[in-house]
């Protein structure tokens, strides 16, 4: 479960997010819609720990993303619209890099990567450089690192 409580983000005098409250229940699919400049990206960046809040809290399965970022981030995966891929890495190298960042134990890393690559159907391209993949395959690689 993700709980957003009284979330506020200010950039100087500009109020980007104004006392936002909502709950995301596990096992459901939600849409996050609004016009340009409504604060959607800012909210998502706060929820995933990429940006700090001015006020409020974001709890991910009870862990505050601002106070316990490592514990909270273990609970979620996030795929931005344009995933930050390293184009000069092979798919496998990138997956190993992502697994290391997520602190997946070395003993479980290879099996975990294999499972995810099969799940998102990128196993057959794991030796290719990311820069040589189609946009669709790059999106799959981004999804794989989020899982």
Write out the residue ranges for each language-model feature.
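ABC transporter nucleotide-binding domains
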Residues: 2-4, 9-147
């Amino acid at each position: 479960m993700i709980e957003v409580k009284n979330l506020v983000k200010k950039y100087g005098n500009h109020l980007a997010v104004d006392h936002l409250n909502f709950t995301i229940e596990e096992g459901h699919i939600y849409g996050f819609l609004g016009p340009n400049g409504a604060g959607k990206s800012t909210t998502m960046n706060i929820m995933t720990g990429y940006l700090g809040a001015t006020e409020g809290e974001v709890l991910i399965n009870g862990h505050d993303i601002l106070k316990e970022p490592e514990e909270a981030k273990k609970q979620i995966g996030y795929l931005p619209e344009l995933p930050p891929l390293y184009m000069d890495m092979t798919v496998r190298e990138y997956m190993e890099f992502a697994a290391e960042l997520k602190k997946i134990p070395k003993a479980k890393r290879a099996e975990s990567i294999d499972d995810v690559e099969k799940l998102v159907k990128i196993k057959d391209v794991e030796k290719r450089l990311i820069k040589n993949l189609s946009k669709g395959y790059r999106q799959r690689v981004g999804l794989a690192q989020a899982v």
